[in-house]
């Protein structure tokens, strides 16, 4: 997808540890056009304005051990101001590292000024 669009992020496996502590949320984002990640389970979906569903997040349990979480979301930095987005990312990191994700999701409290870009990077 080229350019920012308003989308609703929907968990396809709501009880997966990466999805703990958040429900559907809306953001403006730019994501890759429907890539296929072989053998991974689709985890996150967005619906385009025309009604087409696009998978934007996956999880993968490796046969020999290890885990992966991938998402095509997160293009604009401003999305890190969204608590649900931050929680999804941190939950994904914890789960991939084999660390138990709390039932309420990871703590992602951040002071607002810590999320501001320096003026020269805006």
Q: Could you say what each language-model-derived stretch is?
A:
Residues 49-54, 62-122:
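Extracellular ligand-binding/catalytic regions of CAZymes and related secreted enzymes
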């Amino acid at each position: 997808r080229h350019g920012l669009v308003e989308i609703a992020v929907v968990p396809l496996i709501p009880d997966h540890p990466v999805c703990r502590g958040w429900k559907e949320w809306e953001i403006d984002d730019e994501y890759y056009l429907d890539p296929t990640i072989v053998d991974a389970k689709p985890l996150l979906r967005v619906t385009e304005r025309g009604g087409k569903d696009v998978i934007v997040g996956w999880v993968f349990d490796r046969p020999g051990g290890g885990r992966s979480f991938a998402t095509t979301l997160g293009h604009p930095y401003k999305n890190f101001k969204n608590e649900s987005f931050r929680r999804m990312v941190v939950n994904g990191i914890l789960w991939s590292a084999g660390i138990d994700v709390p039932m309420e999701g990871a703590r992602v409290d951040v002071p607002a000024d810590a999320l501001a870009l320096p003026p020269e990077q805006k």
